[in-house]
Amino acid sequence: MEKFAPEFHGEDANNRATKFLESIKGKFTSPKDPKKKDSIISVNSIDIEVTKESPITSNSTIINPTNETDDNAGNKPNYQRKPLVSFKEDPIPSDNPFSKLYKETIETFDNNEEESSYSYEEINDQTNDNITARLDRIDEKLSEILGMLHTLVVASAGPTSARDGIRDAMVGLREEMIEKIRTEALMTNDRLEAMARLRNEESEKMAKDTSDEVSLNPTSEKLNNLLEGNDSDNDLSLEDF
């Protein structure tokens, strides 16, 4: 007849289980070293015994594996962990012949804090539409040059020489546009100088003319005499003019 393990219930089972745990407690515990200090870490209500031989670090960037009993602990350096992810902009290759030109051009037009030499009246004057249109075209061409410089930086960074033709063509186009901009600037400057001369001449004439009298030129005098005399014999010929 088969034998079955005895079953225990209630308080009797609890007492027997307690005695069993006490009997096996000494089999799984090692003698403690009096020189080493133990620490108890509580994780989710579970007590875990950890000795000094296995330090546990959490959320720390400094790793120091030495303990208090080591005499040379002060001589060992602390090792700092490097960040896993770093964001750094890739610099433009130094062997690129157009990188310096592109950088200087960007700095020139981004840091242009000089005030305009035009006054409010000159900017809003209807006679200066042609000048402002020229300046707008110059601004557009400068923007195109900036775009071409950026394209040159990208194109010249390639490892192959297949883009040399494109790069040379763009350099030639850039030189042509710079020459056109120089011509536009000179024409605009000449027009501004001419307007300044006319304005100065008109100012000088207004300063000299202080009387209200109007002087007639010879042709105007003949016409005036003809109208005042009402004489049909005093007809004017082409030679009089």
UniProtKB/Swiss-Prot annotation:
Subcellular location field: Virion; Host cytoplasm
The name under which this protein is listed is Phosphoprotein
Q: Where is this site: Interaction with protein M2-1?
A: 108
* UniProt region (Important for viral particle assembly), positions on chain: 39-57
Presence of the UniProt keyword Phosphoprotein in the record: yes
- A biological process from GO: symbiont-mediated suppression of host NF-kappaB cascade
UniProt entry keywords in alphabetical sequence: Host cytoplasm, Host-virus interaction, Inhibition of host NF-kappa-B by virus, Phosphoprotein, Viral RNA replication, Virion
Chain positions covered by the region annotation Binding to host phosphatase PP1: 81-87
- The region called Binding to RNA-directed RNA polymerase L is annotated at 216-232
The UniProt annotation puts the region (Binding to the N-RNA complex) at 232-241
Task: Please name every pair of cysteines joined by a disulfide bond in this record.
Answer: none
